[in-house]
Amino acid sequence: MTFRDRIHPQLRDWYDASAGFDFDHLETFVPKCNEAELANLKEDPQVVTYDRTIPGPAGSPDVKIRVYAPQDRESSALPCLFFYHGGGFLFGTVYRQEALCQRYVKHVGCVVVSVEYRLAPQWKMPAPLEDCYAALPWAHENHEELGIDPQRRAVAGL
């Protein structure tokens, strides 16, 4: 059975239009995408970026987050944007929308917390969603360290 055979019939036209995307060999395709994302990272001198590991959901692995903050802060308590990268919970990394997260920091004046959630098919739902949620209470409890206002939070993703 191919990947196409497992797709709902109403979505097969979309699949057929996705020529060049090797759905049947995700185990090799996904690492290539991740390598390409890492190779294209560009630092922005106006944005401080660092990685952290936070406690995962109960009984689950810890979760990696990537934090983006303004180099020159105007406040010690900025709004926080929780950002979830695209990829349909199947592929992608926190690096996928690095430039977009940097733009949010510069143009919105916020701190961005991007979550490296677990991916399918290695992890079944609701594991990715649980990882995404784990960042919310963690950031609330650690708002002073992050320099965020716990009352001004938003969620975004692609």
Which residue ranges define each predicted feature?
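Alpha/beta-hydrolase active-site loop
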Residues: 123-145
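Gly/Ser-rich "nucleophile elbow"/oxyanion-hole loop immediately N-terminal to the catalytic nucleophile
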Residues: 140-156
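Short amphipathic alpha-helix adjacent to the substrate-entry channel of hydrolases
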Residues: 95-115
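Short beta-strand element of the alpha/beta-hydrolase
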Residues: 65, 77-87
